[in-house]
Amino acid sequence: MAIATINMTRKEALLAELARDLPHAPARIPMPASDPALAKLNQLGTHLWLDTGNLEEASKLWRREMSALTTNNTLANQVVQTGLMDEVIQQTARRVREVEPGISEDDLVMDVVFVVNCHVALRLVSAFDALVSVELHPAVGHDIEKTVRYAQRYYAVNPDRFIVKIPLTPEGYCAVARARADGIPINYTLGFSARQNYLATLLSRPNYVNVFLGRLNAVVADNKLGDGKYVGEKTTLASQAAVRELRAAHPDIPTLQIAASMRNAQQMVDLAGVDVFTIPPKAVEEFYAQGHKPEEITSRLHEQYEVHLNDDADRSRIEVLWTIDDTFKKLTQDLANRGGVNLTGDDLRAADKDYGTKLFSDFTAEEQAEIRAKGKIPETARWTGRASLDDLMTESALQSFTTDQNAFDDRIRKIIASA
């Protein structure tokens, strides 16, 4: 596998320099304490990541058994809204305008976001000497070339510690394949089903795939389709099994399964043995407070969690989350034979239509706005017959991040107006 090297423009080189120039870099935290229950999770094969971009919050919860932190548009926006990055924003805007005086406001915002995201992540690297996931601006989610370019640029800032998060879209599958061919570590995010991750693993070979399990429980409960219990857990374990099967059959596949969007400490116990947990602070605090003993924690990889649905719920629509049927496997193999680096998003949409697998809904701009207005948890009845549940959840997540990114961008616009 090639290691990414890129020829940077003058502006890109400046932005890389500004991204690495971390004023007041945090000191390395003292050697953290060990937690026996977390150590047991490590022994079962689970890597533990902390899901926060807030350094002070992370410092209180960090333990020796943890190896990475995840940031995203929402978490980065929370940091930016504190004012911590105002000076960085002003300096970056001034320097970029010196190099490119006629730059548009939109392009300048994208450049500043890149630098700020790097600073948020590098502060965590400085304090914890850990891997950190950095997420792309959602505006590039359907643009293969821009996605790959930003992945290369993030990787160039810190190739040893940065993992680039790329959102799950038809173009995303293709961009991930290209970025992985360059040797860039990728966290393919916003996954909600085993079949999405099966396709990603064989076609694109990211380092990580996700199931946002807490939101799956919520969408079933909030839409009164069932009690919502174990929907996300069942999907995560099904995806984990599929990823492990592909890893065993293809030694060159590095993909690990992430259990994301965890809501409570019990899910850490119920999913013990999954490759990676990315855990929000609230769930970690709860886990510590409950005082779990190592002997209570055993592998749950073969657990068959039962999902209770209401009699009037469309079971097939929900079961698609954890089901990978033969037709979908044929679709995946067909696309993999063609090679992810050779495909476009439209190629994936066309194949999905030909096979009748209904993975990609191709929402209109008006539909995206409607989804965005509803937030992370959509109204499923509205999309009956229009969108599969996994794709609807992915689009809802992407639109939710867009809302947070807009708040992030708006703060930058206000600051650069006076820079």
Language-model-detected regions and their locations in the chain:
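Short beta-strand/loop segments at the ligand-binding rim of alpha/beta enzyme cores
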Residues: 38-49, 158-163, 175, 180-188, ...
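N- or domain-start disorder-to-order transition segments that initiate the globular core
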Residues: 2-53
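Catalytic alpha/beta core domains of metabolic enzymes, predominantly
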Residues: 187, 192-337
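Active-site beta->alpha loop and helix N-cap motifs at the rims of alpha/beta catalytic domains
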Residues: 65-68, 73-171, 176
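Alpha-helix-loop-beta-strand connector modules within alpha/beta enzyme cores
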Residues: 120, 125-126, 156-157, 174-183, ...
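Catalytic beta/alpha-barrel core
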Residues: 49-51, 113, 135-137, 160-169, ...
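Conserved, mostly hydrophobic/aromatic
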Residues: 72, 134, 164, 179, ...
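C-terminal extensions of enzymes
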Residues: 2-5, 318-419
